[in-house]
Every structure is written in C-alpha cells, then in structure tokens.
C-alpha cells in the first residue's frame, strides 16, 4: 500500500491491473505467469487448480485475466521495416467440412509473420475491408508483403507495401526471388498442434486471448526475449468488457463450487 501525505489517502500499485481486488496473493499470480511463459502449450485449468491449490473457478479466471493482459501487451506489435519481408495468410481454427468455399466452417484467423515475431487475429470474414486495416496496423510501411493469390490481397501495393504473391493452386510455394509464405504456414501448424495437444477448444467468441498467448510466446522466442520478463515489463489498462458474457456463463455453469478470485 502507498500512503499520500498530501491527500492522506492510501493507494495500491495494483490498481488498474489484473491483480486488483484479487484475494489470491501476488506471488501466486506471478508464479502462474511464470508457468504460462515457460510452457510451450496452453495450461489446462485442471493442472493450474491442482498445482496452485485453488478452485477450478479461480484457475479459470486467473488464466483468462492473464491472457487478456498478454493480449493488451501484444496488440500494438508492428513487424517488418522498409525492405524486410512480411508473410500474410489466413487459416481456419476448428472443424472444416469436406469440400471448399461455402461448405467450410470454423474461425477465420489472419496471421502477419516476420523473422521477429507473429500476430494472429480472429476476424469475422476475409473481405478486403477487414484484412487491410489489420495488415496496416501490424506491418511497417515499405515492407515486402508475401501472400498467396487470394484476390483480396491484389491491391496491397496501393497501401504502400511492395507485394509479391504465389500461386499455391499451381504448387508455387517459393518465387524465383526466394519469397514464400512457408513461415506463416509453419506457424499455423504449430498453433493448431498446441491447441489440440491440450484438448483446448475455445469457443469462437473467446478465441482471441488464446491466439494472443501463443503468438506472444512465439514472438518472444523469435526475438530472444524471456517471455516472463516481457510479460511483467508493463501492465497496460485492461478492457474487461472483452471478457464476454459467454465466459462468465461458463464459470457459473461449470465451476459452481465457489471462487477465491
């Protein structure tokens, strides 16, 4: 606690962070952040509850809050620079029905990848007006942007990027100049394996925090930064409205044994 002699009021450095109003000790929170940063996969709620000695409800909410913190840290990441190659692609997370086009189902995720990290963003559709603002947000102007030949990317050069595309339908995965999207496609495989290995099937409404957690740790490894140090280096304001009503209902329905949060 901090005491101000001028206004004679007490304050806490935890105000505005995920630790505010929590009955769980700060040491327990930091230990869980260390566990998450050192794990290559998403931690299951049951493991956290057993390991920390808290209820499943508390474990669920702690994990959710830390993921929102990671999402806030990773939200403004800008990749690339003038002359550097950025790879952009989309993928589907979840079930995919047989066939193509309208027969598909699943969550659409846009990825922006470079040698310094990756950003993965859940998007509602693959329209140009959805894709371009995110690419502009996370790719530095003047970068080379490598994509497949999806028609929405055809006018990327008008945004100040130097665009190169590959025709995957004709099995063109690397251009004569050496440009490719192999990096982002490899990242998709890594992400999907991570979600499957822990039997994690987040609903589409709450998918983004899981994507941000995985992308944050992947980017830290790419840049040679300790994930835990990056996680506690800053505590931006959290918009808890992003934690949807669906998540709150999940807690009430599945973890009705009381909470320590």
Predicted segments — roles?
Residues 1-261:
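Residue-level recognition of single "structural anchor" positions
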